């Protein structure tokens, strides 16, 4: 249910809908065509009468009206604007001009025209929506109070609830109207859309099926069905649902075409994003958000930030995405300010009454506490939703880090090893946490193998430091000594020599206690011989003497 655009679209070409062929010789009357909602036929009749000199007083008004209902807002605007400039024009022209301007995203012009129109329920509904567009709460409440308990006004109220993310309130209104008007089939699409927004995708499908049984070629309904399939299954299943629309010989209005192009990019995991999404950024609200997501997936955090920094968030999705972008930029730049902003956005969504019990709301609270390094609280929220994310690599990455941060290394290791995404598995954060889990779980050799697979870099040096220090603390002296030995070769710092010396002595003590094979002594001596420190000869003499006494070849 797209009530309006975000961008004026007067310059767009609008496709004319194919004219239906009418059987029989009888010329239909205008009121019959309007009752059948055959607006193409109505325009054809009106234009024919005008050509043969039989046009009536309100011919142009009806042409503008029919063009509006065909989605040809550009032509409708031209007609109503011309009528408004005539002396003594029909007062209805102003509210019609306002409606057309509204649907073209020309909200200022719509407001000016609406205020010139006579007071009516339609004028009040339009001003109600304009107040929402202008974020004018005071005006919004004034026009809200003028709404009556009639279908049009209640539908208008439901759409405002929808746009303000009050989906349950909108559902309640639609269901109440449906109870009394079973033939209002299109309301099922609106109900289905609300359930979609509430993440009840299976319920949305059930409600949508009622409408599609009667109108199987509905562009909006099929698009929503595809979106449900995307959430329930995958992008291929979603794209298959749109195939009929893409192959159709009928021409949906231009906005529906743009919506389909946009959604195909999402279904195809961002394929073609840079070609399709930029022109739609100010037309389809989600296009900006999806382009930001695309940049984040390409690790272009700065470009994502540039695109979203001036967006004033008004929906949970916008707050969440601004939080994610600020968190990513904060980590990349080491900026406490960006991390603080991210934490506040996450807390705002996760703590709100409407989102606190939703999956995204709980993810937000987990993210908030993650940035605050309160990992026990992180786990409270992640544990409550983990059943929904068993195979989600990003979720498991964060979940495993939180497990490890509270010292639950056994479970953390298990979750880390569930991750399949190669990009995550090559990330230093993943490697360092997994290495720590291996060491804490008495598997130092596996941590060492992680290091051996890395290319020489600043990250491999940092991992070596972690292995050296963690293995030393845990009494895995053999791998601590090997790590300190390489560190000493790369950087002849006294602290690395001291670490290696302590680890080598630790290995010797374990040999004496029978917890390490005697043959390891030879490797310890080789490690010590690679050091130029004066203390090393004394240690080597003691070890060699013990080896000779215990018949250990050195």
Swiss-Prot record:
SMART domains given in the database record? TPR
Recorded hits in PROSITE patterns, A to Z, give: TPR_REGION
Segments carrying the region annotation (Disordered) are: 1-23
User: Which biological processes are named by the entry's GO terms?
Assistant: axoneme assembly; cilium assembly; intraciliary transport; protein localization to cilium; protein transport; smoothened signaling pathway
Which keywords annotate this record? Cell projection, Cilium, Protein transport, Repeat, TPR repeat, Transport
Q: Which domain of life is it from?
A: Eukaryota
Per the record, the similarity remark reads:
Belongs to the IFT56 family.
- Know the name of this protein? Intraflagellar transport protein 56
